[in-house]
UniProtKB/Swiss-Prot annotation:
Keywords: DNA damage, DNA repair, Hydrolase. Gene3D superfamilies: Methylpurine-DNA glycosylase (MPG). InterPro entries: Formyl_transferase-like_C_sf, MPG, MPG_sf. GO terms for molecular function: alkylbase DNA N-glycosylase activity; DNA binding. The lineage of its organism: Bacteria, Thermotogati, Deinococcota, Deinococci, Deinococcales. PANTHER family: DNA-3-METHYLADENINE GLYCOSYLASE. This is Putative 3-methyladenine DNA glycosylase.
Length: 209
């Protein structure tokens, strides 16, 4: 069995982390022992404080302070009243992070549907708030815990995804930093979020290995 990604993995540039987390498996172990899991098919990077998006309303001062903890810990920010799952990056004191935006369900589909009933399965985890709900995550129980904790962790992909398997776009729902290609998704995967990038970046973009 693969070893979960350790906090040390996240102690660096969140853009590089996001690219390498794509294709990993997010594992949630419920209190009763049932395992829910999904393949990470969409990730965004936020490299605060140098990232213009961090000063444009999405991150107020208190929230930014909460993010400035040691790397490799689970965090949440709230958007439109919904908690979104992220992981702290870079050294302690720098509020950089990655945001997990979408999952392709692998195990525990029945429980996910119980947590978040939907008429179309593809709408179960194809968004950052949706996946938090489907996994039954309670921010108060998770925030500040290590990314390799038994209850919630990430298993690395077998290998770094090749460039031709990855699409890179601008991020979704931001007003500043719209020109930064810091959203990574599995090309052609039906579980990616339906959100529209904040800017149509000129020319086709592919991720570099």
């Amino acid at each position: 069995m693969a070893t979960p990604l350790s906090p040390a993995f996240f102690d660096r540039d969140p853009v590089k982390v996001a690219r390498e987390v794509l294709g990993s498996t997010l594992v949630r172990v419920l209190p009763g022992g049932e395992v829910l899991s999904g393949r990470v098919v969409e990730v965004e990077a936020y490299d605060c404080p140098r990232d213009p998006a961090c000063t444009a309303g999405r991150f107020h001062a208190a929230r930014t302070a909460e993010m400035a903890i040691s790397p490799g810990h689970w965090l949440f920010w709230t958007a439109h009243g919904h908690p979104l799952l992220q992981v702290s990056c870079r050294e302690k004191g720098i509020p950089a992070s990655i945001l997990i935006r979408a999952l392709e369900p692998l195990t525990g589909l029945g429980s996910m549907l119980t947590h978040r009933p939907v008429s179309r399965e593809r709408e179960l985890t194809n968004g950052p708030a949706k996946l938090v709900s489907a996994l039954g995550l309670k921010p108060a129980e998770v925030v500040g815990t290590r990314v390799d904790s038994p209850a919630l962790h990430l298993l690395p992909p077998p290998a770094l995804l090749p460039a031709d398997a990855v699409t890179v776009t601008a991020r979704i729902g931001i007003k500043e930093g719209r020109n930064l290609p810091w959203r990574f998704l599995l090309r052609g995967n039906p579980w990616v979020s339906p959100g529209v990038p904040s800017m149509d970046l000129a020319g086709p973009l592919t991720a570099k290995s």
